[in-house]
Amino acid sequence: MRTHKLLASLAAFVLMAAATLVTLQAKTSTITGGRGAEKSSLAPSSRIREPLNLAILIQDDLVSRVGNELNVTREFIRALPGGSRVMVGYITSGTLQVRQQFTTDLERAAKSLRIPTGSTAASPYNPYVEVREALLRFDTEGTNRNALLLISDGLDVSRGFDFSSSVNSIDLERAIREAKSREVAIYSFYAPSVGLTSWNRRAVSFGQSALNRLADETGGEAFFQGTSFVTFNSYFNKLGQTINKQHATE
């Protein structure tokens, strides 16, 4: 008799504990959005709807704050639709350092991002030679739309420090021609480097004007706000919305 009572009490205790656990899990799910869920930095409308071939190029001598934007950059990559292909590269000391060749493994591409060195030793004379080199890696076949995201200060001082030399540079024009021939739309996020664009307003103006021309003449868009550094969350939201609108009108 005592054994039956003990078993009954134990069963009741187990049921009560299980009910409590379920209640706690439900509350936790409500608060966090589910197990492992994280609040997204990107608006639902910014998620790319159609598969994309995307090359992301980052200038390696950008200010250290750019390193804080890697998480939202990874989030953008991971949110791309299935069938998308991503390449990641860094423009450093006049060379293109490819961290990840074009791949459909979006997680692998996201993990290939690293913090820019943020050193003048990594400064290129201009980013456009490496932009053209990256463009040559796009396939000429396939149905995906082609896009390149350049995160850079845009400044070209290889042939002098003046407006004409920067905005009408030979390397910039070559990059534009290559992008057009391969049907690659170039988008850009402005960020200052540790060099001239971190303190010289003329340099900022030259760089932003060059980025604007590059994007405008290739069917993309340049994103910058004033002359100071701006976090990338709003840029990625606008980028996704812009690409979706362009897809819808094609």
Language model segments and positions:
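Bacterial N-terminal signal peptides
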Residues: 10-20
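Bacterial N-terminal signal peptides that target proteins for export
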Residues: 2-11
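Scaffold/interface architecture of coatomer-like assemblies
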Residues: 24-250
